[in-house]
């Protein structure tokens, strides 16, 4: 298996948790207090992504050209549900709501909260084995010399996963950094398999859609670890020095 060492380190991490019972008004007020962002027109998914990004901003120096990659299984479900109800039950066309949710809105608002004007990309992904780490893989493969990239995973409540909490997880990648957890890329001989139904059901009971990603972030620097991303693996090593360990900044509403 070929191993590529791109001289990239994870230097910061953050996690924001909430749940469907928490109203949008509270999330908007929290974001306003945290970053001064005018959140009046933000979707719930954008609020969740931006609140997590704001925590990451407090963990390290974010440069103006920092890129932002965000993985999410869908655009804002609540906006789409409202739009579908208006169209199907009230026969009211909602073209602007439809168009407004087919773009990078959540990652754009996360970048605004981070204070960066770098490249942004929303990656359609699920918690299944072959897609969940695609945002990190894309960021690692596209990071220029001396560059930065904030990589996040956001989730807004969906009826199909009734017991899962909402939230967003973020890490900061830096090329050429002196401290942090190194990331290496390894090629696999075959594509990783999807988890079994039993494994998926177990993940459902863990209470968080991105639970496996959250566990991986918690273990950064604590032990050797490997994350599968399609035909690649993203490998991290146990930190040999205290300065290289990652502490995840957390907040919950």
Indicate residue ranges for each PLM-predicted region.
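Conserved "HGTGT" condensation-loop signature of ketosynthase/thiolase-family condensing enzymes
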Residues: 1-97, 101-133, 141-147, 152-253
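Aromatic- and glycine-enriched pocket-lining scaffold segments that form the walls
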Residues: 138
């Amino acid at each position: 298996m070929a191993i590529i060492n791109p001289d990239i380190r994870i230097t910061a991490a953050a996690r924001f948790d909430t749940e469907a019972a928490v109203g949008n008004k509270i999330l908007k007020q929290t974001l306003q207090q945290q970053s001064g962002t005018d959140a009046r027109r933000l979707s719930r998914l954008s609020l969740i992504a931006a609140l997590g990004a704001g925590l990451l901003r407090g963990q390290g120096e974010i440069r103006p050209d920092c890129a932002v990659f965000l993985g999410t299984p869908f655009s804002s479900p609540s906006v789409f549900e409202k739009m579908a109800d208006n169209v199907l039950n009230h026969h009211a066309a909602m073209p602007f709501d439809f168009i407004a949710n087919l773009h990078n809105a959540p990652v754009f608002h996360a970048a605004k909260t981070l204070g960066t004007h770098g490249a942004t990309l929303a990656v359609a992904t699920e918690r299944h084995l072959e897609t969940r780490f695609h945002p990190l893989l894309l960021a690692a493969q596209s990071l220029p010399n001396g560059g930065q990239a904030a990589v996040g995973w956001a989730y807004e409540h969906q009826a199909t996963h009734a017991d899962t909490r909402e939230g967003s997880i973020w890490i900061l990648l830096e090329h050429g950094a002196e401290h942090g957890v190194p990331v290496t890329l390894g090629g696999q001989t075959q594509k990783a398999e999807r988890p079994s139904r039993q494994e998926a059901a177990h993940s459902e009971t863990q209470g968080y859609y991105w639970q496996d990603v959250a566990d991986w972030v918690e273990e950064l620097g604590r032990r050797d670890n490997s994350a599968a991303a399609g035909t690649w693996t993203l490998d991290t090593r146990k930190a040999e020095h205290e300065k290289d360990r990652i502490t995840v900044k957390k907040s919950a509403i």
